[in-house]
Design a protein with these regions (language model features):
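Anionic coordination/interaction segments
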Residues: 1-213
């Protein structure tokens, strides 16, 4: 394993990444937890945006934990919403793990790709070590591309809730090479809710570091 510890003012000089992939699908995960994902072609059919910046880390994928009692929220990964205490990320062949403890809430986020299927798994484990009851929520965010560049495809991406599975589906019928492909985002929890409205989540001029939702 390759282990990286980061904190406020203590980060890697440039993004360090782990590539997790099978022959048809993959994702690139950085030490900050930000990532982009593709299917079949890492350039022509990006599911989420790729930031070509050797210094600054950017992403269209994010997770958040929120204390519903206090309103305090943070990410189980160093970005986009860094918590107050250090993060430890462990990277191996086929997986990356992010460990963090914030205000008595310990979390582990495991990221890996199926050996054969075009599926990325993000497994979030949370333990309450604060010694008192805590009402918590977890939120995942994905910014669809379904093409090579988001500015070119954003007007053509359509999202919907699949009535059978309850998953969030996304498609881009204007991508001629992959028009029949459907991307999905799902959560293994019957109490889940979804929104396909980016502005509703981020707010006007909002950012992943401080979303409105």
């Amino acid at each position: 394993e390759y282990v990286i510890t980061t904190a406020h003012g203590h980060v890697t000089p440039t993004p360090w990444v782990n590539v997790l992939a099978n022959p048809h699908f993959g994702t690139v995960v950085s030490e900050s937890g930000l990532a982009y994902t593709w299917s079949e072609n890492a350039h022509e059919f990006r599911l989420t945006p790729w930031g070509n910046d050797p210094v600054c880390d950017s992403s269209g994928e994010a997770f958040y934990l929120r204390d519903e009692e206090s309103g305090h929220f943070w990410s189980p990964t160093p970005l986009p919403r860094r918590g107050a205490t250090p993060y430890v990320s462990r990277h191996g062949f086929g997986y990356s793990v992010f460990e963090h403890t914030e205000d008595g809430i310990r979390s582990e986020l495991w990221v890996y790709v199926d050996l054969d299927a075009a599926v990325k798994f993000s497994v979030l484990k949370v333990r309450n070590e604060s010694g008192r009851s805590r009402p918590l929520s977890a939120t995942g965010y994905v910014e669809w591309v379904l093409g090579d560049l988001r500015p070119k495809s954003t007007l053509h991406v359509i999202t919907e809730i699949d009535p059978a599975s309850g998953a969030l589906y996304a498609r881009n019928a204007y991508n001629t090479a992959f028009a029949d492909r459907i991307a999905f985002f799902d959560v293994d929890d019957v109490t889940r809710t979804f929104s396909g409205d980016r502005t509703e989540f981020l707010g006007r001029n909002g950012t992943l570091g401080n979303p409105a939702a």
